[in-house]
Amino acid sequence: FGRFFAGSLFDIYGGVFARPHLFDPDSPPRKKRDLRVSAPEVHWFETEDGAQIRLTRYQGGTKGPVMLVPGLAVSSQIFAVDTIDTNLLEYLFANGYDIWLLDYRYSIELPTATSQAPVDNVASYDFPAAVNKIRTVSGADSIQVVAHCYGAITFHMAMLAGLQGVRSAVSSQAGAHFKVVGSNRVKSGLYLDTLLDRIGVDSLTAYTDEDADWLDRFYNTAVRLNPTIDREEMCNSSVCHRITLLYALLYEHDQLNTATHDTLHEQFGVASMNNFQHMGVLAREGKLVSAEGEDIYLEHVERLAIPIAYIHGAENEAWLPESTELTFNWLRENNDRHLYSRQVIANYGHIDCIFGKDAAEDVYPFILNHLEKSA
């Protein structure tokens, strides 16, 4: 008991020297709570360039349809986590929406997660195919979109490339302009993504578990020494440390409950190097450009002349709040200024705006309020 008690204290207060917490893949599956939604309706379909992608429908009513689009190295399950009392899927379902969860080609639930296809292909092919699928199946003339992070970035690319059939959108944490924290600015400035690609690294993952080999375990130890993490955000989760190293701190720890933090390995996984390279280009350019760095998007600002609400965590360290402020001001200067709104969420970071323990009270009402105006 003494050794266990001392070990527990050390795990809590030992900082980088505490034992890392790793998921045991051989443990029995955890019991998940039943979600307060209907049975899912799954639709697989092919994009024009041959990618197999997926939409999962939950028909909570006749409002919408609304398509929920996740970020990078995750899946649409970020909207349906069972570890919080009410997730965004359940929230919109209870409010009468016809909800469609999109898993585009980089979703960690699809075999194409490590595809090296240009990110522009998501905008050019995945979004049009998904919007057309929803309109065809539902019979709706147009849809609404709630897009998070990389999903929001590629949504802006898609709209600026001429996407049709979207009547309003909520953009979480990202837009068409980018400001990054110093550590990410250094990484992009050193072209670390390009360097890794040249030495044969074709993907990076936040996932790790107890079966990790010696190299993975060494990496797990190394990432705990990340000097950019504030002491108040220190923890013993190797997955959490990997997430922070790859992307920046994506949440305020006090906005996640223990169950969500303990199951981050279920939500985060692999991403291909072409995605990291494109994010590096965006960070360096400060605006939407193609994978080759071509300025092909912002010249069509009129294509974003739909109602868009921007939501940004005040503590976001992936894309700083100034990012969506730049996009918000740019749109208001060039289109009808009344089409756009922006809400900065105090005490929230990045993805905690999606699955934070109190997101249903602190964040979701802003999403719902915007959707209701064009439901």
Annotate each language-model stretch with its function.
Residues 317-323:
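Conserved alpha/beta-hydrolase "acid-adjacent" motif
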Residues 117-137:
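Alpha/beta-hydrolase active-site loop
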Residues 1-14, 136-141, 150-290:
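Alpha/beta-hydrolase-fold enzymes
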Residues 70-72, 143-152, 313:
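Conserved alpha/beta-hydrolase "nucleophile elbow" surrounding the catalytic nucleophile
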Residues 334-375:
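Catalytic active-site module of serine/aspartate enzymes centered on a nucleophile-bearing elbow/loop
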Residues 47, 54-109:
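Short, surface-exposed "cap/lid" segments of acyl-processing enzymes
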